[in-house]
UniProtKB/Swiss-Prot annotation:
Coiled coil: none annotated. Phosphorylated by host. It comes from Varicella-zoster virus (strain Dumas) (HHV-3). Keywords: Host membrane, Membrane, Phosphoprotein. It comes from the Viruses. Signal peptide: none annotated. GO terms for cellular component: host cell membrane; membrane. This is Membrane protein 2. Pfam families: DUF1314 (PF07013). The lineage of its organism: Viruses, Duplodnaviria, Heunggongvirae, Peploviricota, Herviviricetes. It is a peripheral membrane protein. Its main location: host cell.
């Protein structure tokens, strides 16, 4: 467990991180006006570290540039929302595990996805999640729909994978993501779901394109591979 003592700069107002508690000497900091900027700054400092959350539990921040899709596809023109994959949070004792996501929007709303229960709203911003809310202020359930990565593979947990193995078992029809605290690697399994072109911040697939690919794609054999999260870089991460 890392005990962090860092100084962040929100404009001209310093902020200090001790554990997972962020203390600011003034409420006029840039973080209050632009939570997305605060989120980028926090992730840049805390990348690769494990911190204690308010109210108990831990958060391991992998700080990737991976985005997942949160949205409905039942009607034409429905918006596809993008969320950034932040890391993995665990309740005290490890009884429950959540994939932590930050919405790609001005406020960087923080969400938690638990396999089997769905998507939970955790905090209005990443700073609020780390300072005061933690996992104890989550709602019962925000949305029960599936969460997909940018290739339209279903996002799920894989709890029983050995961290030191070189071979990864297959699980059909799922994308499994295990965020390991030691190696910073993710074990991914792609399945017979169709693959969309990689999304970027500038371009998103339309609902009609998704329907066409879902309807016309042949079934494929599951393929397993291991990928390493991108190393954090200096400057803006998003």
């Amino acid at each position: 467990m890392h005990v962090i003592s860092e100084t962040l700069a929100y404009g001209h107002v310093p902020a200090f991180i001790m554990g997972s508690t962020l203390v600011r000497p003034s409420l006029n900091a840039t973080a209050e006006e632009n939570p997305a900027s605060e989120t980028r700054c926090l992730l840049r400092v805390l990348a690769g570290r494990t911190v204690d959350l308010p109210g108990g539990g831990t958060l391991h921040i992998t700080c990737t540039k991976t985005y997942v899709i949160i949205g409905k596809y039942s009607k034409p023109g429905e918006r596809l929302s993008l969320a950034r994959l932040i890391g993995r949070a665990m309740t005290p004792g490890g009884a429950r595990t959540f994939i932590i996501l930050a919405m790609k929007e001005k406020r960087s709303t923080t969400l938690g996805y638990e396999c089997g229960t769905g998507l939970h709203l955790l905090a209005p911003s990443m700073g609020t999640f780390l300072r005061t809310h933690g996992l104890s202020n989550r709602d019962l359930c925000l949305w029960r729909g599936n969460i997909y990565d940018m290739h339209m593979q279903r996002l799920m947990f894989w709890e029983n994978i050995a961290q030191n193995t070189t071979e990864t078992p297959c699980i059909t029809s799922t994308l499994t993501c295990n965020l390991t605290e030691d190696s910073g690697e993710a074990a991914l399994t792609t399945s017979d779901r169709p693959t969309l072109p990689t999304l970027t911040a500038q371009g998103r697939p339309t609902v009609s394109n998704i329907r066409g690919i879902l309807k016309g794609s042949p079934r494929q054999q599951p393929v397993c591979h291991r990928v390493r999260f991108a190393e954090p870089t200096e400057g803006v991460l998003m």
